Amino acid sequence: MQANGAGGGGGGGGGGQGQTPELACLSAQNGESSPSATSAGDLAHANGLLPAAPSAAGNNSNSLSVNNGVPGGAAAASATAAAAQATPELGSSLKKKKRLSQSDEDVIRLIGQHLNGLGLNQTVDLLMQESGCRLEHPSATKFRNHVMEGDWDKAENDLNELKPLVHSPHAIVVRGALEISQTLLGIIVRMKFLLLQQKYLEYLEDGKVLEALQVLRCELTPLKYNTERIHVLSGYLMCSHAEDLRAKAEWEGKGTASRSKLLDKLQTYLPPSVMLPPRRLQTLLRQAVELQRDRCLYHNTKLDNNLDSVSLLIDHVCSRRQFPCYTQQILTEHCNEVWFCKFSNDGTKLATGSKDTTVIIWQVDPDTHLLKLLKTLEGHAYGVSYIAWSPDDSYLVACGPDDCSELWLWNVQTGELRTKMSQSHEDSLTSVAWNPDGKRFVTGGQRGQFYQCDLDGNLLDSWEGVRVQCLWCLSDGKTVLASDTHQRVRGYNFEDLTDRNIVQEDHPIMSFTISKNGRLALLNVATQGVHLWDLQDRVLVRKYQGVTQGFYTIHSCFGGHNEDFIASGSEDHKVYIWHKRSELPIAELTGHTRTVNCVSWNPQIPSMMASASDDGTVRIWGPAPFIDHQNIEEECSSMDS
């Protein structure tokens, strides 16, 4: 096949002259050669490789075609042969030139597309000419230019030239990701619809209402495609000015921006051998970076799709030294076992509850990440085993152990007790969760109490006979998840008083927590350890190994950027950290001397974590000393030894 109509073939005749343009397009798409070109030794690749240099036999009938369809012909072949004879080195070079592999051609085209996007057009022309490849099919080039110029009639004619390429069997295979229901005829109709829609909107913006109406009635409507969209487009006729049109249509307006977006949409319908998908090299590089991040066990920085934020010259590997594996501070103000710790939602404070009957609120220094005592809340006679921050961090609710029938609601800013709630001396209120509106909370315990209350402690609703171990309010504002003594997690709807089973374990659920998106649940299961459940599919996703979990209540947590990590205390005095996708721990933190009851990851500072222990201390964990936090990405180049 002589790509793009380049001259060649036996006796200096045009290669493939017997082919119709449609058949030539099909051959270009399918990687087929015309009979005459084959006999002359010229083979073309499916993505448009131009004919190779003259063969070792020195056949003058071969022709070297110029990029993008500029004819070479017999004269060019003769000139090349003469140059080869005059310059032995050049002739030898041409003779030794090998046909590029498919992957090499693909890479060259990707590079060419990227360079084109940078405006290095002359470099692209030279690259295509020297490699013998072409960036895209000539018809696709015309189509691109006409779309960007807004020449809609010519662009529509170009679609007819592209039709054989869209209809070819190879195109069907390449576009396997498209829905099977999309017929080949439908693809052309969709592309035409997108073109005419842009044409219609540009007429409207220019104030050419009659021309726009003509496009709507005589061109768009007869396509009988997406009638709902046509009704929407007809409504734009009522727009009084261009700004109103752009706002209602969510459209950038006539010009390069909107036409580039249109072209991106149109390219998805064409096989890549005809026209490359938009910004294909950037897409591949971004995918490679994302895969490396996914495989990086210690990656704990914000995901950024901008390739400028990473180096493409080295593999991405984060150092363990930037991970919260090192003790930064030991808080010793509690004088007895510390049962619970929890960072505020804004990450500026930490609340710790202890058997010593106090709650201590700590302030996090935004610069040094060190904590200092802010307030001590006293009077919890039975100790504090659970704490919950209100959504806006203005209030703090504290619960006690099994024997405690009271619940304390504190004003964080003033340190004053707003409400001390107790429904009955027989109650056991050991868990609490805030409704997302911040005006209600639910509380309960193992003696069968399950209440919904307002900020003044007034009882709004109750659910009888539910022995609650742990609670969590979902973001829908209606559903409350509760683990109970039947080794399950159930969902309770306080609006219609319905309930349903969500998770069923074989052993007691000591505590659980929910991911920010409400999809995953992390359970601490007696004698089993830490389990990850998918609440939507209601399946057990993973069992994490290493932790020692008996019948003590241990609270684990999600943490890090994107909640990619899981941390839990353990009865063997350690803190265990796992990557969410790995069952084996990536870190075991030592330092506590008794059971670690609770771990909390700072939601705003992903390199900070707190752990509370029966040894009476709270440990603050962070990166290794002397890490420059402003240049943490520089630490991602090598794994710490």
Curated annotation (Swiss-Prot):
UniProt keyword annotation of Membrane present: no
Pfam families reported for this sequence: LisH_TPL (PF17814), WD40 (PF00400)
Annotated Gly residues bias: 1-18
SUPFAM superfamilies in the record: WD40 repeat-like
CDD domains xrefs: WD40 (cd00200)
Localisation: Cytoplasm; Nucleus; Mitochondrion
Sequence ranges assigned to domain CTLH in this UniProt record: 136-211
Every LisH domain range: 103-135
Sequence ranges of the WD repeats: 333-372, 379-418, 424-464, 504-543, 546-588, 591-631
Key words of the record: Cytoplasm, Mitochondrion, Nucleus, Phosphoprotein, Repeat, WD repeat
One cellular-component annotation, GO: mitochondrion
Residues with PTM Phosphoserine: S101, S103
Chain positions covered by the region annotation Disordered: 1-45
Main location as per UniProt: cytoplasm
Annotated Polar residues bias: 27-39
Keyword Nucleus among record annotations: yes
Function: G-beta-like protein involved in cell signal transduction. Acts as a negative regulator in MAPK signaling pathway. Functions as a scaffolding protein to promote G beta:gamma-mediated PLCB2 plasma membrane translocation and subsequent activation in leukocytes. Core component of the CTLH E3 ubiquitin-protein ligase complex that selectively accepts ubiquitin from UBE2H and mediates ubiquitination and subsequent proteasomal degradation of the transcription factor HBP1.
Subunit structure: Forms homooligomers. Identified in the CTLH complex that contains GID4, RANBP9 and/or RANBP10, MKLN1, MAEA, RMND5A (or alternatively its paralog RMND5B), GID8, ARMC8, WDR26 and YPEL5. Within this complex, MAEA, RMND5A (or alternatively its paralog RMND5B), GID8, WDR26, and RANBP9 and/or RANBP10 form the catalytic core, while GID4, MKLN1, ARMC8 and YPEL5 have ancillary roles. Interacts with DDB1-CUL4A/B E3 ligase complexes. Forms a complex composed of at least WDR26, a G-beta:gamma unit, and PLCB2. Interacts with AXIN1.
Name recorded for this polypeptide: WD repeat-containing protein 26
Gene source species: Mus musculus (Mouse)
